[in-house]
UniProtKB/Swiss-Prot annotation:
One GO cellular component term: cytosol
GO process terms (BP): nucleobase-containing small molecule interconversion; pyrimidine nucleotide metabolic process
Predominant location category: cytoplasm
Protein name as it appears in the record: Cytidylate kinase
Enzyme Commission numbers on file: 2.7.4.25
Location within or outside the cell: Cytoplasm
Family of this protein: Belongs to the cytidylate kinase family. Type 1 subfamily.
Species: Bacillus cereus (strain ATCC 14579 / DSM 31 / CCUG 7414 / JCM 2152 / NBRC 15305 / NCIMB 9373 / NCTC 2599 / NRRL B-3711)
Enzyme class: transferase
Disulfide partners: none
Annotated ATP binding sites: 11-19
Gene: cmk
Swiss-Prot/TrEMBL keywords: ATP-binding, Cytoplasm, Kinase, Nucleotide-binding, Transferase
Length: 225
């Protein structure tokens, strides 16, 4: 397995992309790039600066002054904003419910995509997001599009919130996830959609281990070529 390929994992909110991508990266000793965390970090920075997140010009001022870095912690990947560890705070419902608004702006996405491509240019990466296979890494050797029902995704996010000590309402989460799906798939710039050459993987009734196993067997097939 000397060949160092790029693996793109796309899908809607709470489909389990990050969880699976981290495990796949670990198995292959690849770098994991969480593009969602990049948009979350930008959203957090904008909220902290009391910026109007509907205003692209104001957001671009924030982008210019934002340095986002990833570091591998003991059991998880840490996210830093201008040297400050924001790994936990970018997962709060406040940020979660606004990240799709920040991500819909054309200039913001163009700059973030440029940064993501820069991080991935040497290969040996697993990257997850909404537009990785279609836009960020269109030449990725492996492209996966992960799906799960709104109910299943709301359940997962609900458990995640409770485990982190956040208040959580399952019915409200279903509405919020459906709304994020709408925003992500209808936005003008790089909407959420399956790349023509991506393999679709419905994870509704699958465990993390089963999903990882399926992806690893796809990767093995690429290495065997």
């Amino acid at each position: 397995m000397d060949k160092r390929i790029s693996i793109a994992i796309d899908g809607p909110a709470a489909a389990g992309k990050s969880t699976v991508a981290k495990v796949v990266a670990k198995e292959l000793s690849y770098v994991y790039i969480d593009t969602g965390a990049m948009y979350r970090t930008l959203t957090y920075a904008a909220l902290e600066q009391k910026v109007d997140i509907e205003n692209e010009e104001q957001l671009m001022e924030v982008v210019k002054n934002v340095n986002i870095e990833f570091q591998q912690g003991e059991n998880t990947q840490l996210v830093f904003l201008n040297g400050q560890d924001v790994s936990e705070v970018i997962r709060t419902p406040d940020v979660t419910n606004r990240v799709s608004i920040v991500a819909k702006h054309r200039l913001v996405r163009e700059e973030m995509v440029r940064r993501q491509q820069e991080l991935a240019k040497k290969g040996g990466v697993v990257m997850d997001g909404r537009d990785i296979g279609t836009h960020v890494l269109p030449d990725a050797e492996v492209k996966i599009f992960m799906l799960a029902s709104v109910e299943e995704r709301a359940e997962r996010r609900h458990l995640e919130n409770l485990n982190k000590g956040f208040d959580s309402n399952l019915e409200q989460l279903k509405e919020e996830i459906a709304q994020r799906d709408k925003l992500d798939s209808e936005r003008e710039v790089s909407p959420l959609k399956k790349a023509d050459d991506a393999l679709e993987l419905d994870t509704t009734s699958l465990s993390i281990e089963e999903v990882v196993q399926k992806i690893m067997s796809i990767v093995s097939g690429v290495f065997a070529k």
